[in-house]
Amino acid sequence: MSDDVALPLQFTDAAANKVKSLIADEDNPNLKLRVYITGGGCSGFQYGFTFDDQINDGDMTIEKQGVSLVVDPMSLQYLVGGAVDYTEGLEGSRFVVNNPNATSTCGCGSSFSI
């Protein structure tokens, strides 16, 4: 998908830059950042991030700056309207999801409820 199409999930420049850097470190240009939702965490659902070299049937792919973000259909329904970002701060550096669908989140921001 191109940058000028309205997307159900945003992939920020900061996240794309970090993915590009990590892929270069791994020396595997086929890697993509996969974001997914699983049950668990202190709020009911939790975000997960992993590098994957596969795109499965039904996955949505967002390309930015030559790298890809991949989301499975089940996870996408909980992420619509959100943004995958990368932050650096006192608590460390990490990928985060800014999710307008979450009615509450835990203190660390890695789990949420709807």
UniProtKB/Swiss-Prot annotation:
Textual note on the cofactor: Binds 1 iron-sulfur cluster per subunit.
Residues bound to iron-sulfur cluster: C42, C106, C108
Keyword terms of this UniProt record: Iron, Iron-sulfur, Metal-binding
Classification via PANTHER family: IRON-SULFUR CLUSTER ASSEMBLY 2 HOMOLOG, MITOCHONDRIAL (PTHR43011:SF1)
Pfam families linked to this entry: Fe-S_biosyn
InterPro entries: FeS_biogenesis (IPR000361), FeS_cluster_insertion (IPR016092), FeS_cluster_insertion_CS (IPR017870), FeS_cluster_insertion_RrpA (IPR023063), HesB-like_dom_sf (IPR035903)
Protein's name according to its UniProt entry: Iron-sulfur cluster insertion protein ErpA
Biological role: Required for insertion of 4Fe-4S clusters for at least IspG.
GO MF terms held by the record: 2 iron, 2 sulfur cluster binding; 4 iron, 4 sulfur cluster binding; iron ion binding
Family named by the database record: Belongs to the HesB/IscA family.
Protein's UniProt keywords contain Metal-binding: yes
Organism: Cronobacter sakazakii (strain ATCC BAA-894)
Any one Gene Ontology BP term: iron-sulfur cluster assembly
Cofactor: iron-sulfur cluster
Subunit: Homodimer.
Cellular component terms (Gene Ontology): cytosol
Gene transcribed to yield this protein: erpA
